[in-house]
Amino acid sequence: MGRTVVVLGGGISGLAASYHLSRAPCPPKVVLVESSERLGGWIRSVRGPNGAIFELGPRGIRPAGALGARTLLLVSELGLDSEVLPVRGDHPAAQNRFLYVGGALHALPTGLRGLLRPSPPFSKPLFWAGLRELTKPRGKEPDETVHSFAQRRLGPEVASLAMDSLCRGVFAGNSRELSIRSCFPSLFQAEQTHRSILLGLLLGAGRTPQPDSALIRQALAERWSQWSLRGGLEMLPQALETHLTSRGVSVLRGQPVCGLSLQAEGRWKVSLRDSSLEADHVISAIPASVLSELLPAEAAPLARALSAITAVSVAVVNLQYQGAHLPVQGFGHLVPSSEDPGVLGIVYDSVAFPEQDGSPPGLRVTVMLGGSWLQTLEASGCVLSQELFQQRAQEAAATQLGLKEMPSHCLVHLHKNCIPQYTLGHWQKLESARQFLTAHRLPLTLAGASYEGVAVNDCIESGRQAAVSVLGTEPNS
């Protein structure tokens, strides 16, 4: 009788793990268990009354590097090439990004000319920060906060404006708490290997082999900065679900896992609400803190390490305006915590993907709310109403982008505990978990955003690596 692998979590990580397991030459029996009634996790696309697409979660995927190429290969394998909407390298959404500081939008400098000129909100040309960076000695600590690292190497302005904003935009987190080693490993490794971020990025970490396809070659030739799908990014998990069903994968929806226990023969018993499953191996693609509550008593050290990986909430407010125009053209802007602790940033959806504006077309923007403002609200126990978030988002759009009219359409979603926080020492939590799994030979593999990357590409790769670990070899296509 063949092996049974149970995959916990039907987000993009669990779907990717199930996909690669199902494509093995002799695939195991795969059962995908999802607590909610839908698959895709935080990837969710909604069509508005005029046909416009609103992304409630991720809205674009970067094609760069080996991970970006592997995701494009997955898109091709699923037959979605004709649905891809690329943002090419010469597009304003690829070239222009902004910071909102001092009540005004400031374009981030690009190219050598931009680095040599004074560029508000920075008081000096960023060239000088780069020159300073080349002279700084290598850090001696095994980890450091993003703020400390950036301030030490690039100066206080870059730390408090650029890196603070970047941490809010990517992790909805605090740069004074997040780990440089885990959040931005390429920067950490560049300093460790080459003593300098700039030298490390210029010299690179060596070429990583990446797959090849017509879509990957097109993305390279046209220098895509990001891409989406015509009907929204949720087309990707939907196509994965269709593929899994065709491959005989059992998909259980609306089935929260109540507990995991080890049987005498070393197999798992996966307890569901009204039934149970037996598995030779479990891939967990659910949040680390959730998994920690399901583990048996004999895995208490593992549960402790996983429970320490926390996550923060983000309110996503999609707004559409008829007849309105943006003051600038670009991807969007980020807001440092010193400017507005509640508004993380605003994405100019219509600039990158006008094909999704609907008919008649309307200007779409997405306001991300979170940070210390939202954490304080959550801790106070006050009612987090849709009206509160909509008002806050409309005020931000009016103040920061001049969109003072009432939106024609608005969607508000509070994503509770959606972005894991890789705080200082995160790598030690991962090491503790790995050591326990190895020492006790537990048939359990960890995947998902809780561990080594929160972006869609990271999650898909995490699922693929989990499948490779279980199979012991790369699955055939």
Swiss-Prot record:
Q: What name has this protein been given in UniProt?
A: Protoporphyrinogen oxidase
Substitution effect: residue 59 to G: Decreases enzyme activity by 75%
Q: What is the effect of changing residue 290 to L?
A: No effect on enzyme activity
What result follows from mutating residue 169 to E?
Answer: In VPCO; strongly decreases enzyme activity
| InterPro entries referenced in this protein's UniProt entry, alphabetically | Amino_oxidase, FAD/NAD-bd_sf, Protoporphyrinogen_oxidase, Zeta_carotene_desat/Oxidored
What processes does the entry annotate via GO biological process terms? Answer: heme A biosynthetic process; heme B biosynthetic process; heme biosynthetic process; heme O biosynthetic process; porphyrin-containing compound biosynthetic process; protoporphyrinogen IX biosynthetic process; response to xenobiotic stimulus
Q: Which gene encodes it?
A: PPOX
EC number of the protein: 1.3.3.4
Its Gene Ontology cellular component terms are: mitochondrial inner membrane; mitochondrial intermembrane space; mitochondrial membrane; mitochondrion
Q: Which residues bind FAD?
A: 9-14, 34-35, 42, 57-60, 257, 449, 454-456
> What's the impact of mutating residue 76 to F?
In VP; decreases enzyme activity
Reaction(s) catalysed by this chain, per the record, are: protoporphyrinogen IX + 3 O2 = protoporphyrin IX + 3 H2O2
Q: Which PANTHER family match?
A: PROTOPORPHYRINOGEN OXIDASE
Q: Which keywords appear in this protein's UniProt record, sorted alphabetically?
A: Disease variant, FAD, Flavoprotein, Heme biosynthesis, Membrane, Mitochondrion, Mitochondrion inner membrane, Oxidoreductase, Porphyrin biosynthesis
Keyword Oxidoreductase assigned to the entry: answer is yes
**Changing residue 397 to D does what?**
In VP; strongly decreases enzyme activity; impairs protein folding and/or stability
Q: Where in the cell is it found?
A: Mitochondrion inner membrane
What GO molecular function annotations does the UniProt record carry, in alphabetical order? flavin adenine dinucleotide binding; oxygen-dependent protoporphyrinogen oxidase activity
